[in-house]
Amino acid sequence: MKQINDYKGKRVLVLGFGISGLNAAYLLQKLGATVVANDQQVPKDPRVVADLEGAGITAVTGSNPLSLAEEGFDLVVKNPGIPYDTPLVAAFVKKGTPIITELELGYQVFAGHLISVTGSNGKTTTTTLIEQMVAMGNPHRVEYAGNIGVSFSKVAEELGPDDTIVTEASSFQLLGAPTYRPHIAVITNIFANHLDYHKTRQNYIDAKLGITRNQTKDDYLVINWDKEEWQKLAKRTNATVVPFSRLAKSQEGAYQKGGDLYWRQERIMAAKDVVLIGPQNVENALAAIAAAKLSGVANEAIVRVLTTFTGVRHRLQYVLDYEGRRFYNDSKSTDIEATEVALQGFEQPVILLAGGLDRGYTFERLVPYFREHVKALIVFGESKDKMKAAGEQAGVKTIVESTDAVTAVPEAWRLSEPGDVILLSPANASWDQFPNFEVRGDRFIEAVEQLTGKKEEN
């Protein structure tokens, strides 16, 4: 960890008691700040508050009192998910108080090598692939952190100048990271997402590009080259641009040509040997290859990871095979694009379980994918009527309404036959029925296990 004095004697408010918020509060206290930690909920575990106060940190729980904006804080470290138009945050914005996220704090104290991944889809898989590739044969520590469920500031505090962190960075985190500068930045893709938070597509894109805002020509931006829109984004960086392309639209970085994956003019491996299924995972593999090669990773390590890595939980996760039916959990599919790419990964007939929080959009874009891949559609949640309408437009012969992703499992089994894929890929957020996509996916897996009498195979 870097020894910095920027926070000594400063008054800092930490908003949000999540994993990253609590770690940020403790780190700031160690750095000499006077810290107040606030959460609108009262923690279920009383030890959370007791531990904070035992460390000399003031805890304010049960609300976000506007009076905090009048207490002379020098800095706010905000949970990324709290919108800037929330009354308390808006009050600090109006006063001109600097507001950062824990991603920025972690960056400020990290002394080692930083690789960072963002994008609308594929972030977690790509982050994990890169971490495993760079770690293989590396004598120093290599960890992942960030939006992947591990506090960046905590890991940064523990690691030294020869170590590497691969972060997954969300648009929410990047908005509050004004000096963030990874040596290697990766943008997997950019679609319209989180418009309830960012308000406009352009705001969302601008937030994502925060990953390369401070890079120089000595740094690298690895970016998907398969859409003209994404190619244009590369003009907005000072970094050295390294493209990756499943469609071979560039051969300057990592790309697929024919049945093989290449790094520049060097063949790495056959695409069919990548264990992860679907074209989106070829793209994730290419992005990881580029970042790994720029980090000096040997081809043997890259091939070993790509031929053994079976996936990240809830991201097109293979669950089990029972009586000729294969079950997949893609609960992380919270937008239309993710379900599009999931369906493209299967040649077998798909019984699709889809639906969830209604964010106000329709699913007409899914119609051609339904038409080509979906044998039966089981819909649930707030958006079920819109999802059903898309299925009807596609000519899906069997459409069934269910309560949620759990009750849909026996319905899917009833409609299936040997050779079918039963896929949970909701194309919607989970918050209408579940606390998050992880819980939704876990409940789906439990329902599959109960139905089949088997345990998941990963």
From Swiss-Prot:
<dbReference type="GO" id="GO:0005524">
    <property type="term" value="F:ATP binding"/>
</dbReference>
<keyword id="KW-0067">ATP-binding</keyword>
<dbReference type="InterPro" id="IPR005762">
    <property type="entry name" value="MurD"/>
</dbReference>
<comment type="function">
    <text>Cell wall formation. Catalyzes the addition of glutamate to the nucleotide precursor UDP-N-acetylmuramoyl-L-alanine (UMA).</text>
</comment>
<dbReference type="GO" id="GO:0005737">
    <property type="term" value="C:cytoplasm"/>
</dbReference>
<keyword id="KW-0436">Ligase</keyword>
<dbReference type="GO" id="GO:0051301">
    <property type="term" value="P:cell division"/>
</dbReference>
<dbReference type="Pfam" id="PF02875">
    <property type="entry name" value="Mur_ligase_C"/>
</dbReference>
<dbReference type="InterPro" id="IPR004101">
    <property type="entry name" value="Mur_ligase_C"/>
</dbReference>
<keyword id="KW-0961">Cell wall biogenesis/degradation</keyword>
<keyword id="KW-0132">Cell division</keyword>
<comment type="pathway">
    <text>Cell wall biogenesis; peptidoglycan biosynthesis.</text>
</comment>
<dbReference type="Pfam" id="PF21799">
    <property type="entry name" value="MurD-like_N"/>
</dbReference>
<dbReference type="InterPro" id="IPR013221">
    <property type="entry name" value="Mur_ligase_cen"/>
</dbReference>
<dbReference type="InterPro" id="IPR036565">
    <property type="entry name" value="Mur-like_cat_sf"/>
</dbReference>
<dbReference type="Pfam" id="PF08245">
    <property type="entry name" value="Mur_ligase_M"/>
</dbReference>
<keyword id="KW-0963">Cytoplasm</keyword>
<dbReference type="GO" id="GO:0009252">
    <property type="term" value="P:peptidoglycan biosynthetic process"/>
</dbReference>
<keyword id="KW-0547">Nucleotide-binding</keyword>
<keyword id="KW-0131">Cell cycle</keyword>
<keyword id="KW-0133">Cell shape</keyword>
<feature type="binding site">
    <location>
        <begin position="119"/>
        <end position="125"/>
    </location>
    <ligand>
        <name>ATP</name>
    </ligand>
</feature>
<dbReference type="InterPro" id="IPR036615">
    <property type="entry name" value="Mur_ligase_C_dom_sf"/>
</dbReference>
<protein>
    <recommendedName>
        <fullName>UDP-N-acetylmuramoylalanine--D-glutamate ligase</fullName>
        <ecNumber>6.3.2.9</ecNumber>
    </recommendedName>
</protein>
<dbReference type="GO" id="GO:0008764">
    <property type="term" value="F:UDP-N-acetylmuramoylalanine-D-glutamate ligase activity"/>
</dbReference>
<keyword id="KW-0573">Peptidoglycan synthesis</keyword>
<dbReference type="GO" id="GO:0071555">
    <property type="term" value="P:cell wall organization"/>
</dbReference>
<comment type="similarity">
    <text>Belongs to the MurCDEF family.</text>
</comment>
<dbReference type="GO" id="GO:0008360">
    <property type="term" value="P:regulation of cell shape"/>
</dbReference>
